[in-house]
Structure formats: structure tokens, C-alpha cells
């Protein structure tokens, strides 16, 4: 019921980052929920965009890599090379500065703060990983996800 009540307040549900970036840049939208990369892209374009800081904390997520049990053993060295490259400070600096995405290498945060003082704070991060992690609300698996997804699709369709 709450989603249906909010539907008149919505301009539309976006389907790609380009949708919201163009709508924000043109002034069609004044606020949205978006991935960090849209914020970073719009800042690079010189637009005056800002993060909101919900009193409850920002929704956050973490992700990682895994080695599948059916991986090709002949490619194991290449797999580890990729993982090592991704885990590097340089990769973390790129993820933070270009996309606004966090990274698993804490030294990347320190390097960004050293090279671009204040950027981490602007992106909603801290050099202190515990402070960053404690500031967010981590999503948890939902047992009724299919039913919620079906309901959301109905609301988007205007039902």
C-alpha cells in the first residue's frame, strides 16, 4: 500500500544510470536513488549534485569474488592474477575516484585521501573502515523476494 501511495510522487522508475543522469542534468529530476557511479559522473560533468544522509543510514551492500568448483584448472594462474590486480591499491583508487565505489583494500582509501583530501567524505566514506561500515544499513536476503518483486512490478505498471 505504501508504494502505491508514493506512486504519484514519482516521475518514473529508472532503468539505467543514463536515464537518471540525463534527467538530473536537465533538471527533470531534483532527487533520485542511484548508484554511486551516477553521482561521480555528474560531479565530473561539473554539476552541483549532493548525497543525502538519511538519519537511519544509507542502504549499502558488499560483494566479492569466488572461485567456482568447476573452474578450469589450466586457468587458475590467470584467475589469481585477475584477483590480485583487482585487490590492488591502484584498482581501489580507480573504483573510488571514477565510480565512487568502495573497495576491499583499505589502503586505497588512504591513498585517495592523501591524493585528493576531502574526496572520501564527499563520496560518503571515511578512511576508518569501521566508521564507513557502521554508517550503513546492509541489505539482507529476503525470504519473500519473488512476491515483493511481483508487487513492485505491479506498482511500476500503475496498478
Label each region the model flagged.
Residues 62-75, 94-98:
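A bilobed periplasmic-binding-protein/Venus flytrap-type ligand-binding module shared by bacterial periplasmic
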Residues 6-10, 14, 28, 43-46, ...:
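Sec/Tat-exported extracytoplasmic proteins
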Residues 1-54:
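Ligand-binding pocket segment of bilobal, Venus flytrap-like solute-binding proteins
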Residues 93-159:
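C-terminal capping/gating helix-and-loop segments adjacent to ligand/active sites or protein-protein/ligand interfaces
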Residues 14-18, 73, 77, 89, ...:
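Soluble non-cytosolic domains of exported or imported proteins
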Residues 3-4, 21, 25, 33, ...:
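Non-transmembrane alpha-helical segments in soluble domains
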Residues 17-20, 61, 127-129:
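A short alpha-helix capping/helix-coil boundary motif
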Residues 55-60:
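Short, surface-exposed loop/turn microsegments at beta-strand edges and helix-strand junctions
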